[in-house]
Amino acid sequence: MVLSKLQKNLHLLHRAGFGPALEMLPQLSNQTPAQLWAQLVADSKGLPPKIEAQQTILTKADLEKLPTEEARRSLRQTVQRETRQELQRLAGMWLETMTHSKAQLRERMAFFWHGHFATRITRVDFNRDLLQIFREKGLGSFSDLLLAVSKSSAMLAFLNNQQNRKQKPNENFAREVMELFTLGRGHYTEKDVKEAARAFTGWAYKAIPENSDAPNAGETEFYFRKAFHDDGEKTFLGQKGNFAGEDIIRILLQQRQTARFISGKIYRYFVNETPDEKRIESLSQKFYDSGYNISLLLEEIFTAPWFFEEKNMGNRIKSPVDLLVNISRILPLTIGNAKGLFVLQNVLGQTLLQPPNVAGWPMGTAWIDSSSLLVRMQLPYILAGKEALSVAPKPNDDIQMGKKLPAEDLDIKPAFAPKLLQSEVEWGPVENAFEDLSLAQQAAYLLVFPQKAALGAVQEAVKNLSGADRVRQSVLRLMSLPEYQLG
Protein backbone atom coordinates (compact mmCIF):
# COMPACT_ATOMS: atom_id res chain seq x y z
CA MET A 1 0.00 0.00 0.00
CA VAL A 2 1.45 3.36 -1.07
CA LEU A 3 0.80 5.98 1.59
CA SER A 4 0.15 9.62 0.78
CA LYS A 5 1.88 12.56 2.45
CA LEU A 6 -1.39 13.27 4.23
CA GLN A 7 -1.56 9.77 5.74
CA LYS A 8 2.07 9.86 6.86
CA ASN A 9 1.77 13.34 8.32
CA LEU A 10 -1.39 12.49 10.25
CA HIS A 11 0.34 9.40 11.64
CA LEU A 12 3.32 11.51 12.72
CA LEU A 13 1.09 14.13 14.35
CA HIS A 14 -0.89 11.53 16.30
CA ARG A 15 2.27 9.90 17.66
CA ALA A 16 4.65 12.85 18.12
CA GLY A 17 1.82 15.15 19.23
CA PHE A 18 -1.91 15.02 19.87
CA GLY A 19 -3.14 14.97 16.30
CA PRO A 20 -3.60 17.80 13.82
CA ALA A 21 -4.99 21.19 14.75
CA LEU A 22 -7.83 22.38 12.54
CA GLU A 23 -5.74 25.13 10.96
CA MET A 24 -3.00 22.65 9.99
CA LEU A 25 -5.19 20.49 7.75
CA PRO A 26 -4.70 22.32 4.42
CA GLN A 27 -0.89 22.05 4.53
CA LEU A 28 -0.68 18.35 5.40
CA SER A 29 -0.98 17.18 1.80
CA ASN A 30 1.90 19.42 0.71
CA GLN A 31 4.52 19.02 3.46
CA THR A 32 6.81 16.02 3.53
CA PRO A 33 7.01 14.09 6.81
CA ALA A 34 10.61 15.28 7.15
CA GLN A 35 9.49 18.91 6.90
CA LEU A 36 6.70 18.32 9.41
CA TRP A 37 9.11 16.64 11.83
CA ALA A 38 11.50 19.59 11.57
CA GLN A 39 8.59 21.91 12.34
CA LEU A 40 7.55 19.85 15.39
CA VAL A 41 11.12 19.97 16.72
CA ALA A 42 11.49 23.71 16.11
CA ASP A 43 8.15 24.46 17.79
CA SER A 44 9.27 22.63 20.93
CA LYS A 45 12.60 24.44 21.37
CA GLY A 46 13.23 26.66 24.36
CA LEU A 47 12.01 26.57 27.94
CA PRO A 48 8.24 26.46 28.41
CA PRO A 49 6.53 28.89 30.79
CA LYS A 50 5.44 27.22 34.01
CA ILE A 51 1.76 26.34 34.35
CA GLU A 52 1.03 28.23 37.54
CA ALA A 53 -0.94 26.81 40.45
CA GLN A 54 -0.75 27.43 44.18
CA GLN A 55 -0.87 25.20 47.23
CA THR A 56 -2.74 26.44 50.28
CA ILE A 57 -0.53 25.64 53.27
CA LEU A 58 -2.20 24.97 56.59
CA THR A 59 0.20 25.37 59.51
CA LYS A 60 -0.04 24.28 63.10
CA ALA A 61 -0.06 27.96 64.07
CA ASP A 62 -3.12 28.57 61.86
CA LEU A 63 -5.01 25.85 63.71
CA GLU A 64 -3.89 26.98 67.15
CA LYS A 65 -5.44 30.40 66.55
CA LEU A 66 -8.91 28.86 66.38
CA PRO A 67 -10.88 28.46 69.61
CA THR A 68 -12.67 25.13 69.03
CA GLU A 69 -12.06 21.74 67.46
CA GLU A 70 -15.10 22.28 65.25
CA ALA A 71 -13.57 25.47 63.85
CA ARG A 72 -10.27 23.68 63.24
CA ARG A 73 -12.06 20.82 61.46
CA SER A 74 -13.94 23.29 59.29
CA LEU A 75 -10.69 25.03 58.29
CA ARG A 76 -9.07 21.69 57.41
CA GLN A 77 -12.04 20.81 55.21
CA THR A 78 -11.90 24.20 53.50
CA VAL A 79 -8.19 23.83 52.72
CA GLN A 80 -8.71 20.27 51.44
CA ARG A 81 -11.51 21.45 49.16
CA GLU A 82 -9.41 24.35 47.84
CA THR A 83 -6.51 21.96 47.21
CA ARG A 84 -8.70 19.57 45.21
CA GLN A 85 -10.09 22.43 43.16
CA GLU A 86 -6.63 23.84 42.45
CA LEU A 87 -5.34 20.41 41.45
CA GLN A 88 -8.26 20.06 39.03
CA ARG A 89 -7.49 23.53 37.69
CA LEU A 90 -3.83 22.60 37.15
CA ALA A 91 -4.82 19.45 35.27
CA GLY A 92 -7.30 21.45 33.21
CA MET A 93 -4.67 24.04 32.28
CA TRP A 94 -2.28 21.31 31.17
CA LEU A 95 -5.02 19.71 29.07
CA GLU A 96 -5.64 23.12 27.50
CA THR A 97 -1.90 23.48 26.83
CA MET A 98 -1.84 20.07 25.13
CA THR A 99 -4.72 21.22 22.96
CA HIS A 100 -3.53 24.67 21.92
CA SER A 101 0.27 24.71 22.21
CA LYS A 102 2.35 24.55 19.05
CA ALA A 103 4.95 22.69 21.13
CA GLN A 104 3.18 19.39 20.52
CA LEU A 105 6.29 17.24 20.78
CA ARG A 106 7.20 18.75 24.14
CA GLU A 107 3.73 18.24 25.62
CA ARG A 108 3.49 14.71 24.22
CA MET A 109 6.79 13.76 25.83
CA ALA A 110 5.76 15.41 29.10
CA PHE A 111 2.64 13.24 29.02
CA PHE A 112 4.75 10.14 28.35
CA TRP A 113 7.08 10.89 31.25
CA HIS A 114 4.07 11.65 33.47
CA GLY A 115 3.09 8.00 33.00
CA HIS A 116 6.64 6.67 33.30
CA PHE A 117 7.54 8.59 36.48
CA ALA A 118 4.06 8.25 37.94
CA THR A 119 3.24 9.88 41.26
CA ARG A 120 -0.07 10.31 43.02
CA ILE A 121 0.21 13.13 45.50
CA THR A 122 -2.30 15.73 46.69
CA ARG A 123 0.12 18.65 47.02
CA VAL A 124 -0.59 21.07 44.18
CA ASP A 125 2.90 22.59 44.22
CA PHE A 126 4.56 19.16 44.09
CA ASN A 127 2.51 18.23 41.02
CA ARG A 128 3.16 21.60 39.39
CA ASP A 129 6.92 21.39 39.88
CA LEU A 130 7.19 17.78 38.69
CA LEU A 131 5.13 18.61 35.61
CA GLN A 132 7.52 21.46 34.85
CA ILE A 133 10.47 19.06 35.09
CA PHE A 134 8.81 16.85 32.47
CA ARG A 135 8.14 19.83 30.21
CA GLU A 136 11.62 21.36 30.58
CA LYS A 137 13.74 18.20 30.49
CA GLY A 138 11.56 15.69 28.65
CA LEU A 139 13.37 16.19 25.33
CA GLY A 140 16.89 16.56 26.71
CA SER A 141 19.14 14.11 28.51
CA PHE A 142 17.49 11.17 30.26
CA SER A 143 20.33 11.38 32.79
CA ASP A 144 19.34 14.93 33.74
CA LEU A 145 15.65 14.05 33.73
CA LEU A 146 16.12 11.01 35.97
CA LEU A 147 18.16 12.94 38.53
CA ALA A 148 15.74 15.89 38.58
CA VAL A 149 12.72 13.63 39.01
CA SER A 150 14.48 11.59 41.69
CA LYS A 151 15.19 14.75 43.69
CA SER A 152 11.71 16.22 43.23
CA SER A 153 9.51 16.72 46.29
CA ALA A 154 6.70 14.82 44.56
CA MET A 155 8.74 11.65 44.03
CA LEU A 156 10.48 11.76 47.40
CA ALA A 157 7.11 12.16 49.13
CA PHE A 158 5.23 9.61 47.03
CA LEU A 159 7.85 6.87 47.46
CA ASN A 160 8.51 7.65 51.13
CA ASN A 161 12.17 8.60 50.86
CA GLN A 162 11.50 11.40 53.34
CA GLN A 163 11.34 8.55 55.89
CA ASN A 164 14.50 6.81 54.59
CA ARG A 165 17.24 7.12 57.20
CA LYS A 166 20.22 5.05 58.21
CA GLN A 167 18.60 3.83 61.44
CA LYS A 168 15.58 2.53 59.50
CA PRO A 169 15.99 2.36 55.70
CA ASN A 170 12.88 2.59 53.50
CA GLU A 171 13.31 0.66 50.25
CA ASN A 172 10.34 2.00 48.25
CA PHE A 173 12.19 4.65 46.29
CA ALA A 174 15.28 2.51 45.63
CA ARG A 175 13.15 -0.38 44.34
CA GLU A 176 11.02 1.68 41.96
CA VAL A 177 14.01 3.59 40.57
CA MET A 178 15.30 0.25 39.32
CA GLU A 179 12.11 -1.66 38.55
CA LEU A 180 10.06 1.06 36.86
CA PHE A 181 12.38 3.93 35.96
CA THR A 182 15.62 2.35 34.68
CA LEU A 183 16.43 -1.38 34.56
CA GLY A 184 13.08 -3.13 34.64
CA ARG A 185 12.14 -6.14 36.72
CA GLY A 186 14.58 -9.03 36.82
CA HIS A 187 17.76 -7.02 36.29
CA TYR A 188 18.71 -6.41 39.92
CA THR A 189 18.74 -8.36 43.17
CA GLU A 190 17.12 -7.77 46.55
CA LYS A 191 20.64 -7.06 47.83
CA ASP A 192 20.91 -4.26 45.24
CA VAL A 193 17.63 -2.79 46.53
CA LYS A 194 18.85 -2.79 50.12
CA GLU A 195 22.22 -1.27 49.22
CA ALA A 196 20.63 1.40 47.02
CA ALA A 197 18.20 2.29 49.80
CA ARG A 198 21.17 2.86 52.11
CA ALA A 199 22.71 5.19 49.51
CA PHE A 200 19.48 7.20 49.25
CA THR A 201 19.21 7.73 53.02
CA GLY A 202 19.08 11.42 53.81
CA TRP A 203 17.46 12.44 50.50
CA ALA A 204 14.54 14.65 51.44
CA TYR A 205 12.85 17.97 50.76
CA LYS A 206 12.38 21.01 52.95
CA ALA A 207 10.14 24.06 52.96
CA ILE A 208 11.55 27.48 52.11
CA PRO A 209 10.13 30.08 54.54
CA GLU A 210 7.64 32.46 52.96
CA ASN A 211 9.54 35.45 54.39
CA SER A 212 12.78 34.28 52.75
CA ASP A 213 14.52 36.33 50.05
CA ALA A 214 14.85 33.19 47.92
CA PRO A 215 13.02 33.26 44.56
CA ASN A 216 11.21 30.06 45.56
CA ALA A 217 10.10 31.35 48.97
CA GLY A 218 7.10 29.45 50.30
CA GLU A 219 7.90 26.38 48.18
CA THR A 220 10.01 23.26 48.75
CA GLU A 221 13.41 22.14 47.51
CA PHE A 222 15.68 19.11 47.66
CA TYR A 223 17.57 18.80 50.93
CA PHE A 224 20.31 16.34 51.89
CA ARG A 225 20.02 15.46 55.58
CA LYS A 226 23.59 14.38 56.25
CA ALA A 227 22.82 13.18 59.77
CA PHE A 228 20.39 10.59 58.37
CA HIS A 229 22.72 9.32 55.63
CA ASP A 230 24.42 5.94 55.83
CA ASP A 231 27.94 6.69 54.63
CA GLY A 232 29.25 3.14 54.99
CA GLU A 233 30.58 1.03 52.12
CA LYS A 234 27.96 -0.42 49.81
CA THR A 235 27.98 -3.01 47.03
CA PHE A 236 25.63 -2.17 44.17
CA LEU A 237 25.39 -3.95 40.80
CA GLY A 238 28.87 -5.36 41.32
CA GLN A 239 30.54 -2.08 42.29
CA LYS A 240 31.81 -1.16 45.77
CA GLY A 241 32.13 2.25 47.39
CA ASN A 242 30.77 4.74 49.89
CA PHE A 243 27.95 5.48 47.49
CA ALA A 244 25.46 8.33 47.82
CA GLY A 245 22.23 8.61 45.88
CA GLU A 246 23.86 10.36 42.93
CA ASP A 247 26.29 7.44 42.62
CA ILE A 248 23.41 4.97 42.38
CA ILE A 249 21.86 7.02 39.56
CA ARG A 250 25.24 7.16 37.80
CA ILE A 251 25.74 3.39 38.06
CA LEU A 252 22.23 2.72 36.79
CA LEU A 253 22.94 4.87 33.75
CA GLN A 254 26.14 2.91 33.10
CA GLN A 255 24.02 -0.19 32.52
CA ARG A 256 23.09 -0.80 28.89
CA GLN A 257 19.94 -2.45 30.23
CA THR A 258 18.69 1.00 31.22
CA ALA A 259 18.96 2.16 27.61
CA ARG A 260 17.19 -1.04 26.46
CA PHE A 261 14.38 -0.61 28.99
CA ILE A 262 13.69 3.03 28.11
CA SER A 263 14.05 2.47 24.35
CA GLY A 264 11.69 -0.50 24.53
CA LYS A 265 9.08 1.45 26.44
CA ILE A 266 9.30 4.39 24.04
CA TYR A 267 9.03 2.01 21.05
CA ARG A 268 5.91 0.33 22.44
CA TYR A 269 4.32 3.70 23.20
CA PHE A 270 5.14 5.52 19.97
CA VAL A 271 5.43 2.75 17.38
CA ASN A 272 3.80 -0.56 18.18
CA GLU A 273 2.78 -2.37 21.35
CA THR A 274 4.21 -5.55 19.80
CA PRO A 275 7.97 -5.05 20.23
CA ASP A 276 10.46 -5.58 17.42
CA GLU A 277 13.45 -6.71 19.47
CA LYS A 278 16.05 -6.12 16.75
CA ARG A 279 14.91 -2.55 16.21
CA ILE A 280 14.72 -1.89 19.92
CA GLU A 281 18.26 -3.21 20.39
CA SER A 282 19.52 -0.95 17.61
CA LEU A 283 17.70 2.04 19.09
CA SER A 284 19.02 1.30 22.57
CA GLN A 285 22.63 1.14 21.37
CA LYS A 286 22.33 4.55 19.73
CA PHE A 287 20.51 5.92 22.78
CA TYR A 288 23.27 4.70 25.09
CA ASP A 289 26.08 5.93 22.83
CA SER A 290 24.44 9.38 22.58
CA GLY A 291 24.60 9.81 26.35
CA TYR A 292 20.86 9.18 26.66
CA ASN A 293 19.83 11.99 24.30
CA ILE A 294 16.03 11.72 24.18
CA SER A 295 15.59 14.00 21.15
CA LEU A 296 18.03 11.94 19.08
CA LEU A 297 16.18 8.74 20.01
CA LEU A 298 12.87 10.27 18.91
CA GLU A 299 14.38 11.51 15.66
CA GLU A 300 15.71 8.02 14.98
CA ILE A 301 12.15 6.71 15.37
CA PHE A 302 10.06 9.41 13.72
CA THR A 303 12.23 9.74 10.61
CA ALA A 304 12.69 6.00 10.01
CA PRO A 305 10.91 4.48 6.98
CA TRP A 306 9.67 1.62 9.18
CA PHE A 307 7.78 4.09 11.39
CA PHE A 308 5.43 4.61 8.43
CA GLU A 309 4.88 0.93 7.71
CA GLU A 310 1.19 0.06 7.54
CA LYS A 311 1.46 -2.35 10.50
CA ASN A 312 2.50 0.57 12.72
CA MET A 313 -0.39 2.84 11.73
CA GLY A 314 -3.85 2.92 13.25
CA ASN A 315 -2.84 0.13 15.63
CA ARG A 316 -3.05 2.06 18.89
CA ILE A 317 -6.20 2.61 20.95
CA LYS A 318 -6.19 6.25 21.96
CA SER A 319 -5.91 6.90 25.66
CA PRO A 320 -8.77 8.97 27.12
CA VAL A 321 -6.54 12.05 27.25
CA ASP A 322 -5.50 11.49 23.63
CA LEU A 323 -9.14 11.20 22.62
CA LEU A 324 -10.17 14.36 24.47
CA VAL A 325 -7.32 16.40 23.03
CA ASN A 326 -7.69 14.97 19.49
CA ILE A 327 -11.32 16.08 19.39
CA SER A 328 -10.56 19.46 20.95
CA ARG A 329 -7.87 20.21 18.34
CA ILE A 330 -10.42 19.79 15.53
CA LEU A 331 -13.46 21.26 17.30
CA PRO A 332 -12.59 24.67 18.84
CA LEU A 333 -14.08 24.12 22.29
CA THR A 334 -14.74 26.42 25.18
CA ILE A 335 -15.28 24.49 28.41
CA GLY A 336 -16.34 26.73 31.25
CA ASN A 337 -16.14 24.25 34.10
CA ALA A 338 -12.87 22.53 35.03
CA LYS A 339 -14.78 20.27 37.43
CA GLY A 340 -16.85 18.93 34.55
CA LEU A 341 -13.71 18.08 32.61
CA PHE A 342 -12.32 16.35 35.70
CA VAL A 343 -15.46 14.24 36.07
CA LEU A 344 -15.38 13.36 32.38
CA GLN A 345 -11.77 12.17 32.70
CA ASN A 346 -12.86 9.99 35.63
CA VAL A 347 -15.63 8.46 33.54
CA LEU A 348 -13.19 7.67 30.75
CA GLY A 349 -10.66 6.20 33.18
CA GLN A 350 -7.67 8.55 32.91
CA THR A 351 -7.35 11.63 35.07
CA LEU A 352 -4.31 13.85 34.61
CA LEU A 353 -2.08 14.10 37.70
CA GLN A 354 -3.80 11.02 39.16
CA PRO A 355 -2.22 7.87 37.68
CA PRO A 356 -3.57 4.64 39.20
CA ASN A 357 -0.27 3.66 40.81
CA VAL A 358 3.50 4.04 40.51
CA ALA A 359 3.50 1.88 37.36
CA GLY A 360 1.45 4.52 35.52
CA TRP A 361 -1.41 3.91 33.12
CA PRO A 362 -1.97 0.78 31.03
CA MET A 363 -2.17 0.83 27.24
CA GLY A 364 -4.20 -0.80 24.50
CA THR A 365 -7.36 -2.75 25.23
CA ALA A 366 -7.21 -1.78 28.91
CA TRP A 367 -8.90 1.48 27.86
CA ILE A 368 -11.95 -0.29 26.47
CA ASP A 369 -14.82 -1.99 28.26
CA SER A 370 -18.55 -2.11 27.52
CA SER A 371 -19.39 1.13 29.33
CA SER A 372 -16.30 3.16 28.43
CA LEU A 373 -16.58 2.34 24.71
CA LEU A 374 -20.11 3.72 24.62
CA VAL A 375 -19.00 6.96 26.29
CA ARG A 376 -15.94 7.24 24.03
CA MET A 377 -18.11 6.99 20.92
CA GLN A 378 -20.54 9.56 22.36
CA LEU A 379 -17.73 11.90 23.36
CA PRO A 380 -17.79 14.22 20.30
CA TYR A 381 -21.49 14.88 20.85
CA ILE A 382 -21.01 15.26 24.62
CA LEU A 383 -18.24 17.82 24.16
CA ALA A 384 -20.31 19.65 21.55
CA GLY A 385 -23.18 19.86 24.03
CA LYS A 386 -25.40 17.74 21.78
CA GLU A 387 -25.75 14.72 24.04
CA ALA A 388 -25.91 13.99 27.75
CA LEU A 389 -23.56 11.66 29.58
CA SER A 390 -25.47 8.58 30.75
CA VAL A 391 -22.66 6.82 32.63
CA ALA A 392 -21.43 8.01 36.02
CA PRO A 393 -17.81 7.76 37.21
CA LYS A 394 -16.70 4.64 39.04
CA PRO A 395 -15.72 5.96 42.48
CA ASN A 396 -14.09 2.78 43.76
CA ASP A 397 -12.17 1.01 41.02
CA ASP A 398 -8.49 0.43 40.33
CA ILE A 399 -8.15 3.82 38.69
CA GLN A 400 -8.90 5.33 42.11
CA MET A 401 -6.65 2.78 43.86
CA GLY A 402 -9.60 1.74 46.03
CA LYS A 403 -10.09 5.25 47.36
CA LYS A 404 -13.41 6.99 46.89
CA LEU A 405 -13.17 10.57 45.79
CA PRO A 406 -15.05 13.17 47.83
CA ALA A 407 -18.77 13.10 47.08
CA GLU A 408 -18.84 16.69 45.87
CA ASP A 409 -16.35 15.77 43.14
CA LEU A 410 -18.29 12.81 41.76
CA ASP A 411 -21.93 13.21 42.81
CA ILE A 412 -23.47 13.97 39.44
CA LYS A 413 -26.77 13.35 37.71
CA PRO A 414 -26.70 10.91 34.78
CA ALA A 415 -27.62 13.57 32.23
CA PHE A 416 -25.20 16.20 33.48
CA ALA A 417 -22.87 16.82 30.57
CA PRO A 418 -24.03 19.97 28.74
CA LYS A 419 -24.72 21.84 31.98
CA LEU A 420 -21.69 20.69 33.96
CA LEU A 421 -19.14 21.01 31.16
CA GLN A 422 -20.54 24.35 29.98
CA SER A 423 -19.03 23.49 26.61
CA GLU A 424 -19.52 25.29 23.32
CA VAL A 425 -18.05 24.72 19.87
CA GLU A 426 -17.04 27.59 17.63
CA TRP A 427 -18.39 26.00 14.47
CA GLY A 428 -17.34 28.69 11.99
CA PRO A 429 -13.73 27.52 11.50
CA VAL A 430 -14.88 23.88 11.29
CA GLU A 431 -17.42 24.71 8.60
CA ASN A 432 -14.84 26.70 6.65
CA ALA A 433 -12.35 23.82 6.79
CA PHE A 434 -14.75 21.04 5.77
CA GLU A 435 -17.61 22.58 3.75
CA ASP A 436 -15.99 22.14 0.32
CA LEU A 437 -14.81 18.58 1.02
CA SER A 438 -16.57 15.35 0.15
CA LEU A 439 -17.32 12.94 2.97
CA ALA A 440 -14.39 10.78 1.86
CA GLN A 441 -12.06 13.79 2.00
CA GLN A 442 -13.36 14.73 5.45
CA ALA A 443 -12.78 11.16 6.62
CA ALA A 444 -9.21 11.21 5.28
CA TYR A 445 -8.40 13.97 7.80
CA LEU A 446 -10.10 12.27 10.75
CA LEU A 447 -9.58 8.51 10.30
CA VAL A 448 -6.38 6.56 9.67
CA PHE A 449 -7.94 4.00 7.35
CA PRO A 450 -11.59 4.91 6.59
CA GLN A 451 -13.85 1.91 5.99
CA LYS A 452 -16.34 2.01 3.11
CA ALA A 453 -19.19 0.51 5.13
CA ALA A 454 -18.77 3.06 7.92
CA LEU A 455 -18.61 5.96 5.47
CA GLY A 456 -21.73 4.63 3.78
CA ALA A 457 -23.60 4.72 7.09
CA VAL A 458 -22.50 8.32 7.73
CA GLN A 459 -23.44 9.30 4.18
CA GLU A 460 -26.92 7.85 4.69
CA ALA A 461 -27.34 9.70 8.00
CA VAL A 462 -26.53 13.14 6.55
CA LYS A 463 -28.02 12.79 3.06
CA ASN A 464 -31.00 15.03 3.80
CA LEU A 465 -28.91 17.74 5.45
CA SER A 466 -27.22 20.68 3.77
CA GLY A 467 -24.90 23.57 4.52
CA ALA A 468 -23.64 24.02 8.07
CA ASP A 469 -25.86 21.27 9.49
CA ARG A 470 -24.41 18.73 7.07
CA VAL A 471 -20.82 19.70 7.91
CA ARG A 472 -21.43 19.58 11.65
CA GLN A 473 -23.17 16.23 11.57
CA SER A 474 -20.63 14.71 9.18
CA VAL A 475 -17.70 15.68 11.41
CA LEU A 476 -19.39 14.56 14.63
CA ARG A 477 -20.48 11.24 13.13
CA LEU A 478 -17.03 10.52 11.71
CA MET A 479 -15.52 11.22 15.14
CA SER A 480 -18.08 8.86 16.69
CA LEU A 481 -17.06 5.87 14.55
CA PRO A 482 -15.11 2.99 16.15
CA GLU A 483 -12.27 3.75 13.70
CA TYR A 484 -11.76 7.15 15.36
CA GLN A 485 -10.72 5.32 18.55
CA LEU A 486 -7.51 4.29 16.78
CA GLY A 487 -4.52 6.47 16.08
Task: Enumerate the predicted regions with their spans.
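Substrate-binding/catalytic groove segments of enzymes
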Residues: 122, 186-188, 452-454
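Short, compositionally biased low-complexity segments
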Residues: 7-15, 59, 67, 82-84, ...
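Flexible, low-complexity segments enriched for small/polar residues
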Residues: 2-5, 10-24, 255, 259, ...
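Hydrophobic residues in alpha-helical segments
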Residues: 26-29, 40-41, 99, 134, ...
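Active-site substrate-binding loop specific to GH73 endo-beta-N-acetylglucosaminidase modules
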Residues: 72-74, 90, 126-335, 339-343
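Generic detection of long, well-ordered alpha-helical segments
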Residues: 2-3, 26, 30, 85, ...
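N-terminal accessory alpha/beta regions
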Residues: 22-128, 133-135
